[in-house]
């Protein structure tokens, strides 16, 4: 059976891995997943990531903890295959009054809500992370 929403699966694997205090989680890789993970690394929500495998690429995400507690308090899928959520540059969401990030897929790639505001771009709201 094929996966209906690979991004939601990735976010769920990260959430479950952190709830179980895992060092890392593995998942199938794609360009979109890799760009979201790169963004989470730049924002300090994960330690690092690795892409491995010859024929089937696998993404390994190394989770981040601070004083034994997960750095990610909330990770939530917003736009999904059955209900796409798009916001223009004036209506981009602020997660937890700016303490978290909204991951936005724009015409210039995947970026945070802050970056999209600076660029003057809107797009599809993929997820919230705080």
From Swiss-Prot:
Keyword Ribonucleoprotein: yes
Keywords associated with the record: Ribonucleoprotein, Ribosomal protein, RNA-binding, rRNA-binding
One BP term from GO: translation
A GO CC term attached to the entry: ribosome
Summary of the function given for this chain in its UniProt record: One of the primary rRNA binding proteins, it binds directly to 16S rRNA central domain where it helps coordinate assembly of the platform of the 30S subunit.
The family this protein is said to belong to: Belongs to the universal ribosomal protein uS8 family.
Assembly notes: Part of the 30S ribosomal subunit. Contacts proteins S5 and S12.
Classification via NCBIfam families: PRK00136.1
Name recorded for this polypeptide: Small ribosomal subunit protein uS8
Organism encoding this protein: Buchnera aphidicola subsp. Acyrthosiphon pisum (strain APS)
């Amino acid at each position: 059976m094929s996966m209906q929403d690979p991004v939601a699966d990735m976010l769920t694997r990260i959430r479950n891995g952190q709830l179980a205090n895992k060092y890392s989680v593995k998942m199938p890789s794609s360009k979109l997943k890799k760009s979201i993970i790169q963004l989470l690394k730049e924002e300090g929500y994960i330690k690092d990531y690795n892409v491995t495998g010859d024929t089937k690429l696998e993404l390994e995400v190394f989770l981040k903890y601070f004083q034994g507690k997960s750095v990610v308090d909330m990770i939530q899928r917003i736009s999904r295959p059955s209900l796409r959520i798009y916001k223009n540059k004036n209506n981009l969401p602020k997660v937890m009054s700016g303490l978290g990030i909204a991951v936005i897929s724009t015409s210039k790639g995947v970026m945070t809500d802050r970056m999209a505001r600076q660029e003057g771009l809107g797009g599809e709201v993929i997820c919230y992370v705080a």
